[in-house]
Amino acid sequence: MPDIKYLKKLALIGAINKIIKVSSSEFQKHTGASSKTTARKLKQLEDERLIERKIVPGGQLIKMTDKGIEVLKNEYVDYSRIFSPDLDILELEGKVLKGLGEGQYYVNIPGYRKQFEEKLHFVPFPGTLNVQLSESSSSLRNLLLETPAIRVEGFNDGERTFGGGKCYPVVVGSIEAAVVVPERTHYPSDLIEIIAPIKLRDALKLKDGDRVVVQLKKQGTENQK
């Protein structure tokens, strides 16, 4: 189990976004631990691949890995659940961009399209709105994935097998929509793909780079999680 305290301290002094140079004695001031303990904790973080570290004259170069950042994001989600247990609406903010098209692929296959109509109660427009989440909202993506979802079942059409996925009902600019998350996906952790009954880009006059707010309404129970 990683020592979150030391990982958090590294993030606070900048190692989450860039390579920083810090000596053991300097980092010791941030942790309040002995130099021996500080050195041991840094070695543990490196061994667990939560940080990348290189010893250089005058100190060491340190940068958090994607795995280390994910550990802190999960910690953030836990604290959000502790201090905001009755939060009814989760807001995610990001910018519109051209995406990977996985959600669009789902929308245009009859076996999926029928389920969307039955379970989301709308016929989806044959396309998606792709949103790259801001840094703060990216941290909340895990919280979104832990909320009750609407299950989209996988199926076989006689020629090939299609995997399942989950949908999270959302509102985008007062329009009912849903975030689509395939079971097997190549999405970056900061990207979400949204389907809706109409073309959101046209309805909301959005273009690449525009800011958009996505509101997730928590459901009472998940539909076949």
Swiss-Prot record:
Residue span of region Riboflavin kinase: 90-225
SUPFAM superfamilies for this protein: Riboflavin kinase-like, Winged helix' DNA-binding domain
InterPro entries: RibK_CTP-dep (IPR039063), Riboflavin_kinase_archaeal (IPR023470), Riboflavin_kinase_CTP-dep (IPR023602), Riboflavin_kinase_dom_sf (IPR023465), WH-like_DNA-bd_sf (IPR036388), WH_DNA-bd_sf (IPR036390)
A GO biological-process term: riboflavin biosynthetic process
Residues engaged in binding FMN: T185, E193
Cofactor descriptive note: Binds 1 Mg(2+) ion per subunit.
Reactions catalysed, as given in the entry: riboflavin + CTP = CDP + FMN + H(+)
Region (Unknown): 1-89
Cofactor: Mg(2+)
EC number in record: 2.7.1.161
Residues annotated for CDP binding in this entry: G99, L100, G101, E102, G103, Q104, I198, K199, L200, R201
Pathway: Cofactor biosynthesis; FMN biosynthesis; FMN from riboflavin (CTP route): step 1/1
Broad class of enzyme this protein falls into: transferase
Keyword list, A-Z: Flavoprotein, FMN, Kinase, Magnesium, Metal-binding, Nucleotide-binding, Transferase
Binding annotation for Mg(2+): T128, N130
GO MF term set: magnesium ion binding; nucleotide binding; riboflavin kinase activity
The protein's role, per its UniProt record: Catalyzes the CTP-dependent phosphorylation of riboflavin (vitamin B2) to form flavin mononucleotide (FMN).
Family: Belongs to the archaeal riboflavin kinase family.
Name of the protein this chain belongs to: Riboflavin kinase
